[in-house]
Regions:
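Helix-rich effector regions associated with P-loop NTPase G domains
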Residues: 1-7, 17, 32-35, 47, ...
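Conserved beta-strand/loop subsegment of P-loop NTPase cores
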Residues: 131-138, 160-169, 190-196
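Walker A/P-loop
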Residues: 227
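Canonical P-loop GTPase G-domain recognition
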Residues: 173-224
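Short, Lys/Arg- and Gly-enriched loop/turn segments at beta-strand edges
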Residues: 97-106, 144-145
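Histidine-anchored nucleotide/phosphate-binding helix
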Residues: 148-158
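Conserved hydrophobic positions within beta-strands
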Residues: 39-41, 102
Length: 344
């Protein structure tokens, strides 16, 4: 029966069977996934990337290059300005004990990006891939806090849909009440604010819970005590003042590179100090859309007389009326106007 059924096959089906018989006994190449190990890019150095592989692999950090095919795809698509960024989840083909080749890059779930410093054209420079949140550290005093710098970063974070927590360090210098007088406005519009003192250990437990098993962008002006705060998170850390920036090899905001710094609690807890906070650009935000990233304006902007109201000079503006009533903080509104007019 079987033989007669074979005889009734079409010539095309017979050719297919012969092809399968010819090649079915040949050794098959291994599936790509069996040769690859998963990891996260913790540092970028030119065309080389330090990849920390997942627990259980032979080598936790490998120096990797990118597969030529991926580079060719980037050249063909000029819109892909940053092929591999710190924070990217990648798949690496090991090469020896310490090296590897990046074969695949997982899709990013979030990014923190900016205009390339010194470049006037629109170009996306991904500072960090897949961040979970941002921690903006300011000091209550020494140095004096400049909230317009904070407002500018909050716009960038809102645009990137990046949850942000504000940490106010050095409250031992002013007292909590004085710090709240400056930063309480951010609590009132929905931001979480942690009042801390590295000197007295206040607010440390809140910070630890905030960071566990997350990739956190840590940023803020120089001298606000970022390293001192991190020292208090775990007794195994012994960073001196400035050591965090030295560890990240960034000097004083002189490079665009970032690096993930693993913390010794949780399974995948990383912090990343972002370089060049003063160079963060609002390059991809149309001025008319800036209002969407000042969260306190949202409940008022729909009540403006003109649908395209910029909340600057137009009559019957509900946002300006809210400022006059004190419902919107005047300093925040002034920050909005400065950004609206490009006075960064």
């Amino acid at each position: 029966m079987a033989r007669r059924r074979v005889q009734r096959l079409s010539e095309e089906e017979q050719d297919l069977m012969q092809f399968e018989d010819r090649y079915k006994n040949r050794p098959r190449p291994k599936q790509e996934s069996t040769d690859l190990v998963a990891g996260i890019v913790i540092r970028a150095r030119g065309h080389h990337y330090d990849v920390q592989t997942d627990p259980g692999t032979d080598n936790r950090v490998r120096v990797c290059e990118v597969r030529g095919r991926l580079l060719a795809e980037q050249i063909a698509d000029r819109s892909k300005d940053t092929l591999v960024a710190v924070g990217d989840h990648v798949w690496v083909r090991p090469n020896g004990k310490e090296k590897g080749l990046i074969e695949r890059i997982d899709e990013r779930t979030s990014v923190l990006s900016r205009q390339r410093p010194g470049v006037n054209v629109l170009a996306e420079d991904v500072i960090l891939a897949n961040p979970d949140q941002a921690l903006v550290v300011f000091a209550a005093a020494d140095p004096e806090p400049h909230t317009r710098m904070l407002d500018r970063f909050l716009v960038i974070a809102e645009f990137n849909e990046l949850p942000t927590v504000i940490c106010v360090n050095k409250i031992d210098l002013t007292g909590r009440a004085a710090a709240e007088a400056i930063f309480g406005q951010y609590e009132r519009i929905g931001y979480e604010v942690i009042y801390a003192s590295a000197e007295r250990g206040e607010g440390i437990e809140q910070l630890r819970e905030l960071l566990i098993d997350r990739i956190t962008v840590v940023t803020g002006p120089s001298g606000v005590g970022k390293s001192s705060l991190i020292n208090h998170l775990d007794q195994r850390l012994h960073l001196q003042v400035g050591d965090l920036r030295d560890f990240l090899h960034k000097g004083k905001h002189t490079t665009r590179a970032a690096q993930l710094f693993p913390l010794p609690f949780g399974e995948k807890t990383y912090i990343a100090d972002t370089p060049g906070i003063r160079e963060l650009g609002l390059y991809d935000i149309d001025p008319i859309d800036l209002q969407f990233y000042f969260v306190e304006m949202q409940e008022y902007r729909h009540d403006c007389h003109y649908s395209g109201c910029t909340h600057d000079h137009e009559p019957d503006c509900a946002v300006r009326a809210a400022v006059e009533r004190g419902d919107i903080d005047r300093e925040r509104y002034e920050s909005y106007l400065r950004l609206l007019h490009g006075e960064e």
